[in-house]
Amino acid sequence: MADASVRVEDKLFYNRYLVDSGRAHIKVRPHTEPPPALLSMLKLCPARCYELNEAGQVEVTVDGCVECGTCRVIAEPSGDIEWTYPRGGFGVLFKFG
């Protein structure tokens, strides 16, 4: 039986990422007050790519994104983010096992 005490963060550590510098596949729409969809991403993103900066705005760091699509479903329909697939060969490289 699998060890139930293994955290998601520990499993994500084994994945590798090929960052496409200067071409983020997720862009947050500029805002002064974070909309509800972006605030929900602070808790819902499994890779914890969304954070509040010191000005109280939501920022995204795509370097650790697992491309699960959660933010695409929650924040893209409202226009709070722009989500595109990473260019071929870039993004998450999953390690199975």
Swiss-Prot record:
The keyword DNA repair does not apply. This is Ferredoxin-like protein. Coiled coil: none annotated. One of its GO terms (biological process) is nitrogen fixation. To ferredoxins from P.putida and C.tartarivorum, ferredoxin I from A.vinelandii, ferredoxin II from D.desulfuricans. The lineage of its organism: Bacteria, Pseudomonadati, Pseudomonadota, Alphaproteobacteria, Hyphomicrobiales. Could be a 3Fe-4S cluster-containing protein. Residues 56-86 form the 4Fe-4S ferredoxin-type domain. One of its GO terms (molecular function) is iron-sulfur cluster binding. Keywords: Electron transport, Iron, Iron-sulfur, Metal-binding, Nitrogen fixation, Transport. It comes from Azorhizobium caulinodans (strain ATCC 43989 / DSM 5975 / JCM 20966 / LMG 6465 / NBRC 14845 / NCIMB 13405 / ORS 571). It comes from the Bacteria. Gene3D superfamilies: 3.30.70.20.
